[in-house]
Each structure stands twice: as structure tokens, then as C-alpha cells.
A protein has these predicted regions:
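Acyl-donor (CoA/ACP) binding surface of acyl/acetyltransferases
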Residues: 1-48, 71-202
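Active-site rim helix/loop that mediates acceptor-substrate recognition in acyltransferases
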Residues: 53-75
């Protein structure tokens, strides 16, 4: 984790929660959300592309308790349909300007219940989270990565305006597929603002 274990992630300290979009509501995840999130994260078709897939309820409870502070939940009509990850990190800089690189970029991730697919919910939620990163947290760069074979995930990155910055051959060891390719996408804060301005003109 990019932040110290005993530190509260900056996004949790914002006063904007719960954040409402056209159809959804986003809010920081709580320990009590673990039961609902288990239902879709434990599915084989979902766990296929996750960095960790709980082997049983005990494993899930232990890991979720350790990680939930970095997550938000996405609700539709009061029901949780997915979760988002938001982690901030430092950029790289030469020693003389290193102080200007602290906590200036964010890494995003997401998981949605299969029945929520194909309705634009993920796009709506991720766009809202990018706006939070840029306008509320002052991030200058937002990144997201995926297994190259997880096309729905990187297609989502493209829909929200991220550009593919790298394609790495056999860089990651998948539990079932062996060594597989990976992709990295990113968008800068200025690019995000330009995208919003362009859409507002349409």
C-alpha cells in the first residue's frame, strides 16, 4: 500500500460522501460491506482477473479487513453492485524537486457484479472517481492496469479517456494462465479537464 497502514486515505477525509451521479451513489467502503462484496468477488468469473481471489470466507474476511480502507462501494437504488479502489502514490523526481512529487498520482481499480455489466454503470462510476481524484484530491495523473486478456477492463479505461501507455509481454504470473501480458493506461489532470470541457460543448 502506498500510504502507511495506520494512515487514513485522503479520499476518506473528503466531505463529499456519499457522492451521487446520474444513477449511482459512491461512498467509502465500510467493514460491514464485506458480506455483500463477498457475493460477487467470490465468483470464479470475477476472481479470474483479480490480483487476489479469496479461497474461503475466512480468507476474504481477513484480507478485506486489511484492505477495505482503500475501497469505495458503488450503489444502485440502495444495493451494492461493485467496488472501486483508490490508492495515491508519489511520482518520480530528481532529488532537488522530490518534494513536489509526493502523493501526486492515483491508481484506480474496480470490480463489478456480473449482472451490472453492459449498462454503463462502471463507466459512470469510474468517471466520477476520476473527477474526485482531479478536482478534490489534486492528483496530476491517474493510472490503471489490467491483464491484457481482460478486455472489458481495458475497454473501460479507454471509454473514460485513458490512453494506453504500455503493453508488457508476459510480465505477470496468473494463477491459471501462467505468465501473461499486461497493459497500463493513464490520464493527466489537464487531459481530464479538457475532456469534460469538450463534452460540455457537445
Amino acid at each position: 500500500m502506498s500510504e502507511q497502514a495506520d494512515a487514513t486515505p485522503a479520499f476518506r477525509q473528503l466531505s463529499i460522501w456519499p457522492l451521487r451521479t446520474e444513477r449511482l451513489m459512491l461512498r467509502p467502503a465500510e467493514l460491514s460491506d464485506g458480506e455483500v462484496l463477498w457475493r460477487h468477488r467470490s465468483l470464479p468469473e470475477v476472481g479470474m482477473w483479480l490480483g487476489w481471489h479469496p479461497v474461503d470466507r475466512e480468507d476474504w474476511n481477513e484480507t478485506y479487513t486489511a484492505k477495505y480502507a482503500d475501497y469505495l462501494v458503488v450503489e444502485l437504488d440502495g444495493e451494492i453492485i461493485g467496488d472501486l479502489m483508490l490508492r495515491t502514490s508519489d511520482g518520480w523526481g530528481q532529488r532537488e524537486v522530490k518534494d513536489q512529487t509526493i502523493a501526486v498520482q492515483a491508481e484506480l481499480g474496480w470490480t463489478f457484479a456480473p449482472e451490472a455489466g453492459g449498462k454503463g454503470y462502471a463507466t459512470e462510476a469510474v468517471e466520477a472517481l476520476i473527477s474526485v481524484c482531479v478536482e478534490q484530491l489534486g492528483m496530476r495523473r491517474i493510472e490503471a492496469g489490467a491483464f491484457a486478456e481482460n478486455e472489458p477492463s481495458w475497454r473501460l479505461m479507454e471509454r473514460v479517456g485513458m490512453r494506453r501507455e504500455s503493453y508488457s509481454v508476459k510480465e505477470s504470473l496468473h494463477r491459471d494462465l501462467g505468465w501473461v501480458d499486461g497493459v497500463l493506461y493513464a490520464i493527466l489532470a489537464d487531459e481530464w479537464r479538457e475532456r469534460l470541457a469538450h463534452h460540455q460543448k457537445d
